[in-house]
Amino acid sequence: MVTYTCDKCNKEFKQKGNYTKHTKRITPCAPEIKNTLIVTVEGTHGANAEVADTINLSTEPIIPTNLKFIDLFCGIGGFHQALVRLNGTCVFACDIDEQCRKTYEKNYNLKPEKDIIDVNIGSIPDFDVLCAGFPCQSFSNSGKKKGFDDKRGKLFESILDIALQKKPSFMFLENVKHIKKIDNGKIFKHILDRINETGYYVTTTELSPHQLGVPQQRERVVFICIRNDLYKKEIDLNFKIPTIPINLDAIFEKDTTKTEKYKISKEEEEILTVWDKMVNKFNIDENLSPTILCNEFQKKYTEEQMKELPSWKQEYITKNKPIYQKYKEFWDSWLIDHKKILTKKEIYGKLEWQAGRKKENDSIFNHFIQLRQSGIRVKKGKYFPTLVAIVQTPIYAKEKRYITPRECARLQSFPDSFILNENDKIAYKQFGNAVNVEVVHFVMSNTLKAYNFIK
């Protein structure tokens, strides 16, 4: 039988194709030094796994002159934006969403493949970094938290299939922070274990744009994965987060001709004005109930009827009683005067006040607002609410308008040169799904610099 032997590491191959692939690998082989490496996987949620892995260790990583990366579940290119800033070149991208592929191609002159499951891994050009914002709908609060029972959750395995064959030096994966808590942490531990089994040391970090000066609270988990033969225990991956002041003004559109079309409707302005009368009635420094169900105030329930209500509703009705009794005369008059609008839509009768204790001259119109299925949510004006793919576009109440797609782009740290989808509804969804550029840029730049992959 003919065998093929590598003249550098003396490894033998029975098939010429495997020998050829070995000689063309990204990280050149070195004289064989067999070691048993015990890799401890540490996630910030305390997941641990030890896996013994016999590998070939090279003394130093080969530093690429031109960092190449692939962008899986690429969306509109949050990872792409970050890695191009690090002088990286994208050699492959894929996303199932047609509109995302169109936006991606328009901005980067690279046409993403459609379905990761149909990709011929062997056809993917060699690369140094794999990045993926793998589907979060299975794991986020906005989704149904189906975890790995859902097909989208299982797409995670497609990432590992590519890593197993192509063996990139680094992987950076992003997901919602709630992924740590699903099924009592079992899903998170499974992810860590599978990454480790694929041949990578992995640690995680939690980061939100507001920690980097971007006025959006959007906590995400970033998985930092380093190929076992490159991992160095002495390199500290707990990066110090710089103190950067929040700059709300940098987000807002200054040209009012560009914001006019985003004004809230007359009906929306009316319901917010009605609720603002209620807010004005509260005393300074008073704590508004987290959720007020005003259409429940005058209802009478027997003990049995109360038990039949959902537990969340029972809780809110109980918490609302003292508020109603304290301002009963006002509430009764207010409910009569505004019954038509308060009962027009179910959400109009619910107020989720998340703006803290009432301040002097406080008003609903001092804050950000979202019209959600759960009610009218009022958030402190310090940060924008988290952008989500589900249509809950934040309202900038001071100007009585929705934030624009361009403002959404800025909240996700995309440059003003980025070409938006022409359909606003699609653009909102795309930015709601996007990876925040500053968050992944911070993690990747610090990791790659620590390993001397970039200057």
Regions found by a protein language model. Give the residues of each.
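Conserved Class I S-adenosyl-L-methionine
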Residues: 186-202
